[in-house]
Amino acid sequence: TLCNQMVNFLGIMQNEWASAQSFAHFDTLLVPFIHQDKLSFKMVSDCLESFIYGINIPSRWGTQAPFSQITLDWNVPQEFINKKAIVAGCECDFTYGDCQKEMKILHDALFEVINKGDISGRGFQFPIIALYLNPDFDWMHEEELFKACAKYGTPYFLTKEKQDVEGYFG
């Protein structure tokens, strides 16, 4: 799956480049796959669980897990809303803006996995999660996100409105 390919990519790149390896727009760029394949919440959750566990296992790449980060847009960014979505290198007949429902599925599934922790209930070391805040952020309906904040102190919150953060995370 795409999530397993991302794990392999991060594992390989940690041996080639220094510092954190990051996937910017993690949610925005993944949701077209959910939309196209009509994935259920359970299927999305299983894929993200595989991704999270995969990047926290140091096998194959030496002595440490890949130092990795993902950035979440939470809402489809303006620069993507009217762009045709790309799945498997092909332009789709829908836009990224058509995938906001799938964004909610991805976020709920991701933070459900994060909140469960590992088999012992411990939090995951990676990925470091950064979340872009914007004026459209729904502070009242993000239960899984705020559970993660309370339990593990993740994610980091960033705002594009007050500073230029584009160069920080790829």
Spans of features found by a protein language model:
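Conserved catalytic cores of very large enzyme subunits
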Residues: 1-170
